[in-house]
């Protein structure tokens, strides 16, 4: 018995996607088991039932959310043209299909990020060369935005700041490897097209009008609700969280005056979302992640990290270091905002 007691078994679980509906169901099962309404055997059975595979409708919705997210990011942050928006949305759907195929194929999943980057860059260059000129970098960045590990970088810094050093460093390493794979895919596709004589025509088309920010924000909020598999009853909450987080970040940047606008805006957005998530968890008795996870998706600096690694591989060391410092600043600002949000309103539990 002493030998058994001194034996430790470590099981490695593959990182899964965020599924807010199943998270809420698991939270409800735990609450009912603690309250004595469910015995352990029945609770365990219900938890096992949560591992059911996605339905055909859920898979189609997930693919569509990739396209909607890419198109909305192209309009909301990059202020590209209508053509760039449409092409980014189509490429986003292609990446959604690749991601769906990789979910059930472990060998494909290892290289899915690089394959997605190759596909996105190749399609953008071919369309720009033979159909209509595009802003290549904007289209590729918008189409890959869901794969860029901004959320992983944020969670890594948050865990490190909470003294969870092992898990934080592991997340940081995973996020950096994803950035390297995405950057490698874009550079490889660019060089491959150049080898075949396919040259993109860079041409600045008229940008989208300013009023498109608001419908793009609503479309992004709906896309995130689908992407994070939120239950229909939680869709209004998710949409409000995304809209409030974005508007708070923009407002915080406008009132910063002499301070850097981006870090101040991200801090204000993180602070408000962190407090809102804890208030929602306390009064609705549901996980605060329903607000926190989709709400900060527009705040995480994943695109900055992608650009930093891209500049580094292009041997533009100065610009890469400058962008890398901006990445660190934004990460610290966002994590600081979330921590102060927890300080204002204490969380109900870790979810």
Which residue ranges define each predicted feature?
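Hydrophobic alpha-helical segments embedded in the membrane of multi-pass proteins
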Residues: 64-68, 89-97, 118-119, 214-221, ...
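Soluble N-terminal domains of membrane-associated systems
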Residues: 1-49
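Alpha-helical membrane-inserting segments
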Residues: 73-77, 94-103, 119, 123-131, ...
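C-terminal transmembrane helix-loop-helix hairpin of multi-pass membrane proteins
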Residues: 139-143, 155-158, 163-181, 207-212, ...
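Core alpha-helical transmembrane segments of integral membrane proteins
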Residues: 56-155, 227-228, 232
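Cytoplasmic-side transmembrane-helix entry/capping segments in multi-pass membrane proteins
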Residues: 60-61, 87, 108-119, 141-142, ...
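Generic multipass alpha-helical transmembrane bundles of integral membrane proteins
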Residues: 146-157, 163, 170-263
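Short juxtamembrane and helix-loop transition motifs at transmembrane-helix boundaries
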Residues: 41-55, 68-80, 95-108, 192-206, ...
């Amino acid at each position: 018995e002493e030998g058994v007691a001194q034996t430790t078994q470590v099981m490695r679980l593959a990182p899964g996607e965020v599924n807010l509906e199943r998270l809420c169901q698991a939270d409800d099962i735990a609450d009912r088991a603690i309250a004595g309404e469910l015995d352990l055997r029945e609770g365990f059975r219900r938890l096992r039932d949560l591992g059911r595979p996605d339905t055909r409708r859920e898979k189609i919705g997930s693919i569509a959310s990739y396209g909607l997210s890419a198109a909305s990011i192209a309009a909301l942050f990059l202020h590209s043209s209508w053509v760039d928006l449409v092409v980014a949305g189509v490429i986003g759907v292609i990446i959604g299909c690749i991601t769906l195929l990789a979910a059930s194929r472990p060998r494909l999943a290892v290289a899915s990020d690089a394959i997605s980057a190759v596909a996105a860059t190749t399609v953008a260059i071919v369309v720009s060369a033979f159909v209509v000129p595009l802003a290549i970098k904007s289209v590729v960045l918008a189409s890959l935005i869901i794969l860029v590990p901004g959320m992983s970088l944020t969670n890594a810094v948050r865990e490190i700041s909470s003294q969870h050093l092992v898990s934080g460093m592991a997340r940081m390493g995973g996020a950096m490897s994803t950035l390297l794979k995405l950057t490698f895919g874009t550079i490889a596709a660019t060089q491959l097209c150049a080898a075949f004589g396919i040259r993109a025509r860079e041409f600045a088309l008229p940008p989208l009008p300013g009023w498109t920010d608001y419908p793009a924000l609503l479309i992004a909020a709906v896309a995130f609700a689908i992407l994070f598999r939120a239950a229909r009853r939680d869709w209004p909450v998710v949409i409000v969280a995304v809209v409030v987080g974005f508007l708070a970040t923009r407002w915080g940047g406008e009132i910063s005056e002499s301070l850097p606008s981006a870090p101040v805006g991200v801090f204000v957005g993180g602070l408000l979302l962190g407090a809102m998530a804890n208030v929602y968890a306390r009064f609705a008795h549901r996980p605060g992640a329903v607000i926190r996870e989709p709400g900060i998706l527009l705040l995480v600096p994943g695109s900055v990290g992608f650009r930093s690694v891209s500049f580094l591989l292009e041997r533009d060391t100065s610009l890469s270091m400058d962008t890398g410092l901006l990445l660190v600043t934004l990460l610290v600002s966002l994590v600081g905002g979330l921590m102060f949000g927890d300080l204002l309103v204490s969380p109900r539990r870790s979810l």
